[in-house]
């Protein structure tokens, strides 16, 4: 069976990756401290347990990957030195490169890799699809392991090198033995930076130091691939939840790099000659309204359909983003922009009266709908406010509960009723890497309690997603994507509230920033 094209797997990343060709670092100053303001507070250290981007970015600081996606959408070896694929693409062999060492001093072995893949495959949505196709996966010696498939799965290399939500980060086997439903509390990787646990102050600061034992590939950095060179001795993540304070700190030179700036600050920062404002992901992000399928009222399809018809993307974008330069309404669950799986099939038009009728048909009993509101994250806080007003316009009672982003990320894992600490709705966003195809889109999964937070159950959705992965003919893949979208707009696993771009900013003394669909802090000097 021929391997599925990377274009099919990560099609939406084309525009992102095409601009990510940062030059190879040459005469840059080395050493010093990079002072970085992340988009949220880091509270969860396990990038397999959660898909939260703050934890993914932490993962890229300290972990490494077997394979990686470069700026040209090519999967390249990273920890792997060489690999082979049988002619029928049913057998794979991977050999690690020399010099790989975990931060605790132990060597990285094939056993660690197999254990990490197994844990990731029990949690990640693409990993689950791959795991379902496995016959066996075993270490051959300390540096080599093999994967044998039971049924065809053309995305093995792409899955092992997926760049986001969740990348396959390699950790020691003793940590990878942790049940994927439980968090790993110890942050031990083999990547270019080490996590300094003693200096971690949740709600304030995260510290990383250069890993002197890390041996980068002798290649130019390219996307998430190539040589990962730590050019600073220390990276400090400084959590500043108040945008005005972060803005003042950046302009005063007290910080170097602000990951996600609120759009109303962009015009001022663009005029500052000492700063550069840039769009972190030119393809944009998809806004996501996620209902809890386990608890009333959204365990009823009619209530979820009420949400779908009540959401007017233009109104959300005007309220959340404001500047049309940075947003557009998009009817496709696979995002818009001339992409292979972009389609308007099945997309309804907003209809508030129909939404009211559907909510009434759902037998909604008037209990308050708990909407989690992360007030420190503009791209989740603002849509929460809009949704609260939309629900009230439908005649629903709303309990808008304020919290920070990291608290919301932890709480959304709770399956209990809202009265016992659970929830009904949360808002987030996903970059192109994470929603562009039926395989990578975690919000589409219908795997029940093994699905992404919100836990929709749909055997038909899982059947179609598995069929999409096995299909090799592009026209048939497009047709399957349309079937999946039609089904999703009927079952409503989530509601898209628009497509938008998120800018970041850094001082011009900062060099080597990689523009990619994930925040990467190697290659940077100050």
Which ranges hold each PLM region?
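Extracytoplasmic/peripheral linker and loop segments enriched in polar/acidic and small residues
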Residues: 399-413, 438-508
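Structural transition elements
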Residues: 193, 325-361, 375-382
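Periplasmic binding protein-like
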Residues: 105, 389-445
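Ligand-site clamp/hinge motif
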Residues: 216-268, 397
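N-terminal lobe/hinge region of extracytoplasmic solute-binding protein
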Residues: 37-87, 118, 188
